Regions:
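Class I SAM-dependent methyltransferase Rossmann-like catalytic core
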Residues: 2-22
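Conserved alpha-helix/loop element of class I SAM-dependent methyltransferases that forms part
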Residues: 20-40, 54
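Class I SAM-dependent methyltransferase SAM/SAH-binding core
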Residues: 42, 48-100
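A short acidic, Gly/Pro-enriched loop at the edge of an enzyme's catalytic core
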Residues: 101-109
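A short SAM/SAH-binding and catalytic strip from SAM-dependent methyltransferases
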Residues: 108-122
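A short glycine-rich, Lys/Arg-flanked "PGG" loop and its adjoining helix->strand segment in the class I
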Residues: 123-138
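Conserved catalytic/acceptor-binding region of the Class I
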Residues: 140-208, 223
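Conserved Class I S-adenosyl-L-methionine
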Residues: 178, 195-275
Length: 275
């Protein structure tokens, strides 16, 4: 089963807003993952490359970033961005997070943002990433929280309805929308030491930021309609309500990201042998 969200230009616009909202916190967490200059970094599900740039900068010219995604279109966008910005230390591969054993190296940092909730077996994906971390290296996973509907003040029925159908869509497609909160215990049970755990709630201040929910609905609507979760006219009615909400100056909305930075000590190996 493939990626259930569109990966075209409109989806990239939405990803651009999300990246901007989370960028500062993500860069701060990367800076906590030891000295990365001259080191090997693996980014899984690099998308259109927003974080690939920061990772390439952190590794420096003597270090390398291996960026993997299972979408050729996303890899093309990411490659273009990295080249435009003059980085020559990034290697791109088309590949699946569930199958990282073809990689020859172990990495000082394995980084993965907003990918695990798209994967059919997120626990297996985490095991694969843990196996790719070198002794004393780090794993940094960041996942958006779509656990409940509390993303708005005053409360909005449209946001609640959107979160309800979003969760249905992930469930019907066998995705774990609770992985943002589960991943910390999964990582700990694989023997890694949790060094930092953060729940970040950036506010969506401008009209364009507040459009995030309407944009997400547009990107997911074809899959939701295909799965019978919503009919086309209800989807377009809900879309209108979400656009309307983004125009309101008195409504506050926000997004959430849970991030876990974990370290693998030398004794970790016995816990994560392949299942
Ligand atoms: C929401 S985007 C996040 C992109 C990027 N990590 C960021 O934070 O901007 C999710 C990315 O994961 C990729 N992806 C989804 N399932 C994957 C899988 N099984 N293996 C590798 N990449 C996957 C998608 O193609 C998409 O580029």
């Amino acid at each position: 089963m493939g990626y259930i969200i569109k990966t075209d230009d409109s989806a990239r616009l939405r990803l651009g807003i999300q990246s901007r909202l989370y960028e500062q916190s993500s860069v701060d967490l990367i800076s906590r993952a030891g000295t990365l200059r001259g080191r090997k970094i693996l980014e899984v599900g690099c998308g259109s490359g927003a974080m690939t740039l920061h990772l390439a900068r952190a590794a420096g010219p003597q270090g390398t970033v291996t960026a993997i995604d299972n979408s050729p279109a996303q890899l093309d966008a990411s490659r273009e961005l990295v080249t435009e910005n003059g980085f020559e230390n990034v290697n791109f591969f088309e590949g699946d997070i569930n199958c990282l054993d073809h990689l020859d190296n172990l990495y000082d940092l394995v980084y993965c943002r907003m990918v695990l909730h798209h994967v059919a077996d997120a626990d297996h994906a985490i095991r694969e990433m843990v196996r790719s971390v070198c002794p004393d290296g780090y794993l940094l996973c960041e996942e958006p929280v779509i656990h409940d509907g509390s993303f708005c003040f005053p409360p909005s029925e449209a946001i609640d309805e959107f979160i309800r159908i979003l969760r249905s869509c992930f469930s019907v497609n066998g995705r774990d929308y609770n992985i943002a909160f589960r991943m910390e215990s999964v990582i700990r049970n694989l023997g890694l030491q949790i060094e930092h755990s953060r729940l970040h709630h950036p506010l969506l201040n401008s009209r364009q930021d507040k459009l995030l929910y309407a944009m997400s609905l547009s990107d997911l609507a074809p899959q939701m309609i295909k799965n019978g979760i919503v009919d086309p006219s209800s989807a377009s009615e809900l879309h209108e309500k979400l656009v309307h909400l983004s125009n309101s100056e008195t409504t506050m909305t926000w997004a959430r990201m849970h991030s876990v930075l974990a370290r693998k000590s030398n004794g970790t190996e016995r816990h994560y042998s392949k299942a």
